[in-house]
Amino acid sequence: MANDVSGLGPTAFVRLLAFHLIGLFVSITVYRLFFHNLSGFRGPFIARLSSFYLAWLSAKRLHLHDEIDDLHSLYGDYVRTGPRELSIIDPQCVQVIYGSQTKCIKGPIYTLLDPRTNLSSTRDKTEHAKRRRAWDRGFSTTALHTYEPMVQELTEELMTIIDELSENPINITEWVDKYAFEVMGQLTFGKPFNMLKERKEAYFLELIRQDMNAIGYLLNLPWLSYLFLRTPGLNQNHLNFWRWIENEFAQRIARGQRRPDVFNWLHQAYLQGPQTKSDTLKLHGDGYLVIVAGSDTTASTITHLLFYLACNKALTQKLQAQLDALEGLTDESLRDVELLDACINETLRLRPAVPAGVQRETPKEGIYIGNRYIPGDTIVKVPMYTLFRDPRSFEQPNEFIPERFTTRPELVKDKSVFIPFLTGSYACVGRRLALMEVRRAVAAILCRYDIALAPGQNEEGFLDGKIDAFTLVAAPLSLKFTRRHQQKQ
């Protein structure tokens, strides 16, 4: 038989190979369409065959959450979005998939940054719990108290820029981005990058944006993302960013701690371990996580909240009155302003930080959501954008009504689905710092200025201009700032 095969001519060999590939393709197609354990779930025909469908939806405009929302309108609570992937908005799914007792683990998408595995991309639950301890110390109440002076200083720098530019409309998105990245940059590397003070864009901010946009296009094809991030020439920006992080960490260690920062806690945990090459790469990965997860999401929330307030004068005046009554703008005093937190929550409901949801993988035995069985080894995602606008959970779901979280609780039918910072053991560790930044920035602006959309700033244009690059990135927002008589420092 071996002699027969070796005696094949080139043409015969190509034909044999073609028949083999065609047979393989047909068998995979038939299996995925009719015999796969997800064949009973509805969804686009092409999605059943290939993950390229989901990647195509994302790449069209980087509005994946809008595309997923449309699919749920067509197919219902469960949509098959890939050969072994489901998008789910059944209200019962939240605790089953993300809760503290979930049997699901993080999906394969979290391997993209290996071997620079950060806390968020750690799939093993035991290792995640071990690494989480250092992060919990770095974001504890005591630690946050030490970060507050730095946040206040940067808030004042943001206000100085608004003071100087307020005679004309201001693209507030640009300056809020710099504000959020400056905070996390200083907490990660223990030094100022002076993006606000010197009116400049730091090198790392440009690299992050380029990297995140690339990830937004390739995120739903992990194997292609893996190749892209490891192919010379294509991965140059990615490699430049990691070299920059390595250099900044080396400088931070050489300088020592000058003021409280998150890195100190992560580095202490690193020093208590074997300090292997793998540990060092994971420390670099954690630096990436602090900057990206703590910046994009916070900046987007601040910008979108300012947009909603600029469109709602009566609500803004009511909030300003409550802020004016405070003796000072401290983190402690701002936490007590219920309407401010309600506005933040409503912004996160309408514009969640990760709108298309985060990926999980079901255990081999599968899971039940109510009476619906989800087979094992299935990738599942809960699109927060759609879930948070579900009329089964929220009255007037597409309207910005912060009072649903204060004086009008009847507008919230099922509060268990609202998890803007996730829930369970994987809940956002930096939640309280993010809220401190948002409260500080928004309160400082409203105490000093009345805000309105600038002439020519279109509401729909702003909302439609956002980018879904896994995290939500706000479009440019032009606001008019008018100085108030009442001011609070």
Swiss-Prot record:
Broad class of the protein's primary localization: membrane
Record's bilayer topology term: Single-pass membrane protein
GO cellular component term of the entry, any: membrane
Required cofactor names: heme
Compartment(s) where it occurs, according to its Swiss-Prot or TrEMBL record: Membrane
Residues passing through the membrane, by range: 13-35
InterPro entries named in the record: Cyt_P450, Cyt_P450_E_grp-I, Cyt_P450_sf, Cytochrome_P450_monoxygenase
MF terms in GO: heme binding; iron ion binding; monooxygenase activity; oxidoreductase activity, acting on paired donors, with incorporation or reduction of molecular oxygen
Induction: Coexpressed with the other cluster genes on brefeldin A production optimized medium.
Enzyme class: oxidoreductase
Record-listed heme binding positions: 428
Keyword Iron: yes
Glycosylation sites: 37, 118, 171, 345
Record keywords: Glycoprotein, Iron, Membrane, Metal-binding, Monooxygenase, Oxidoreductase, Transmembrane, Transmembrane helix
Keyword NAD appears in the UniProt entry: no
Function text: Cytochrome P450 monooxygenase; part of the gene cluster that mediates the biosynthesis of brefeldin A (BFA), a protein transport inhibitor that shows antiviral, antifungal, and antitumor properties. The proposed biosynthesis of BFA involves formation of an acyclic polyketide chain that is differentially tailored throughout the backbone.
Name of the protein described by the UniProt record: Cytochrome P450 monooxygenase orf5
The species this protein was found in: Eupenicillium brefeldianum (Penicillium brefeldianum)
